[in-house]
């Protein structure tokens, strides 16, 4: 009698009555149950979540074949997981990349990339308005390894050219667009400048998304995402990704295995789920962002709007060349002081007062209060005026959001 019907598409092993009797000798039924239906394949249309820390080999021969790289299998969860690998393949297709590595957060992804690719005593060039924690990591930690970092303005092309010509620069790193002022670099141009001298280019395209910008096709060597944001799109997990050539991503993967910032397979599943609707979400956010930028720029109680879709933005023409949409993140300055801006923020009804961006829900924050722990003089030096607002538009109805913003402006 066959205990499990033999079906090659559904399971790897078939357990017969004689095998059950053999397994049962000296074991109770619980242990027998644990051995049945392991490694079962299904016809599910959704990617399976594989929650396991380790993987078994059917015999020692298979184990040795794996160790000697004759077959490709899984061994331990920190080194790989079927759910996570499916996610990596999907992101690679989106980015046009040879390989992708997904990790526990965007912050971890950028840090391990820098550690893997910049040698001791190497030199990094980065833009001044890169993510605050990334800058802290560069200035306070990488310098302990003898790595020097030069920060330049995002539009300082001449400065970049001088640095790569006169120094052995290992890597150029920038966000494009940046947060919160939505500055962008000409990716084709900076890649051309850097590649002449053998300098790698990594672009954090979190705000751009793989939908609105094909970063690798524009010439960058690597594209980084905080997948927590637009790719996941639901504000319910942390994740980061690096995509690029097999050679570069493999170097990052090797260090990642040592550092251990592994993405949980449940989070990988949520990210795969989010990717199914990303193009729809981003399309809605592109539309809402563009229309709200125009509404805000025309409003007498708004003194300035930062949005690449507007001709008033200094990098508007660059964005038009390399992006197919601008997204749902806008920064703007209220015509008033700190208290006036707080009054506007607190009068809003739809968005949550929260950090982050890119999810289904609209989020708003006043940058001065979001970085309240930084002295005001330092905030002002970096352009964070007391009246600066960052608004991440979600997928709510445009007319509802517009009405809410306008009524809040009427209160000041």
Curated annotation (Swiss-Prot):
Cofactor note: Binds 1 pyridoxal 5'-phosphate per subunit.
Modified residues (N6-(pyridoxal phosphate)lysine): 229
CDD domains: CGS_like
The protein's annotated pathway: Amino-acid biosynthesis; L-methionine biosynthesis via de novo pathway; L-cystathionine from O-succinyl-L-homoserine: step 1/1
Names of the cofactor(s): pyridoxal 5'-phosphate
Keyword annotations from UniProtKB, A to Z: Amino-acid biosynthesis, Methionine biosynthesis, Pyridoxal phosphate, Transferase
Source species, domain of life: Eukaryota
Catalytic activity: O-phospho-L-homoserine + L-cysteine = L,L-cystathionine + phosphate; O-succinyl-L-homoserine + L-cysteine = L,L-cystathionine + succinate + H(+)
One BP annotation, GO: transsulfuration
Record-listed pyridoxal 5'-phosphate binding positions: 76, 78, 106-107, 131, 226, 228
EC number(s) recorded for this UniProt protein: 2.5.1.160
EC class (word): transferase
GO molecular function, one term: pyridoxal phosphate binding
SUPFAM superfamilies: PLP-dependent transferases
Family the UniProt entry places it in: Belongs to the trans-sulfuration enzymes family.
Function summary: Catalyzes the first committed step of methionine (Met) biosynthesis. Catalyzes the formation of L-cystathionine from homoserine esters and L-cysteine, via a gamma-replacement reaction.
Listed name of the protein: Probable cystathionine gamma-synthase 2
């Amino acid at each position: 009698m066959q205990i499990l019907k033999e079906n090659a598409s559904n399971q790897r092993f078939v357990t017969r009555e004689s095998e059950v009797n053999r397994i049962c000798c000296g074991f109770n039924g619980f242990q027998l149950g644990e051995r049945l239906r392991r490694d079962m394949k299904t016809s599910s249309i959704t990617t399976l979540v594989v929650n396991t820390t380790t993987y078994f080999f059917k015999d020692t021969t298979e184990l040795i074949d794996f160790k000697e790289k004759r077959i490709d299998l899984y061994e331990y969860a920190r080194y790989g997981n079927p759910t996570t690998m499916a996610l990596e393949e999907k992101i690679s297709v989106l980015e046009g990349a040879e390989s992708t590595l997904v990790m526990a957060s965007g912050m971890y992804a950028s840090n391990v990339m820098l550690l893997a690719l910049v040698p001791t005593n190497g030199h990094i060039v980065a833009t001044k308005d890169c993510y605050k924690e990334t800058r802290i990591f560069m200035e306070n930690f990488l310098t302990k390894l003898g790595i020097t970092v030069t920060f330049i303005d995002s539009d300082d092309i001449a400065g970049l050219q001088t640095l790569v010509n006169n120094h052995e620069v290992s890597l150029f790193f920038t966000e494009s667009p940046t947060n919160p002022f939505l500055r962008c670099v000409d990716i084709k141009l900076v890649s051309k400048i850097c590649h002449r001298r053998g300098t790698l280019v990594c672009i954090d395209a979190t705000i751009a998304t793989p939908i609105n910008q094909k970063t690798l096709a524009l010439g960058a060597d690597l594209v980084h995402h905080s997948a927590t944001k637009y790719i996941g799109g639901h504000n319910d997990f942390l994740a980061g990704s690096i995509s690029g050539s097999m050679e570069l991503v493999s170097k990052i993967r090797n260090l990642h295995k040592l550092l251990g910032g592994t993405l949980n397979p449940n989070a990988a599943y949520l990210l795969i789920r989010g990717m199914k609707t990303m193009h729809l979400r981003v399309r809605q956010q592109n539309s809402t962002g563009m229309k709200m930028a125009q509404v805000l720029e025309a409003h007498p109680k708004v003194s300035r709007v930062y949005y690449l879709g507007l001709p008033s933005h200094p990098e508007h023409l660059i964005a038009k060349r390399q992006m197919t949409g601008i997204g749902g993140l806008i920064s703007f300055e209220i015509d008033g002081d700190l208290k006036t801006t707080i009054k506007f923020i607190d009068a809003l009804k739809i968005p949550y007062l929260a950090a982050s961006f890119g999810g289904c829900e609209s989020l708003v924050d006043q940058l001065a209060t979001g970085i309240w722990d930084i002295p005001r003089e330092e905030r002002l030096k970096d352009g964070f005026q007391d009246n600066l607002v960052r608004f991440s538009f979600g997928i709510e109805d445009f007319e509802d959001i517009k009405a809410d913003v306008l009524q809040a402006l009427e209160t000041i």
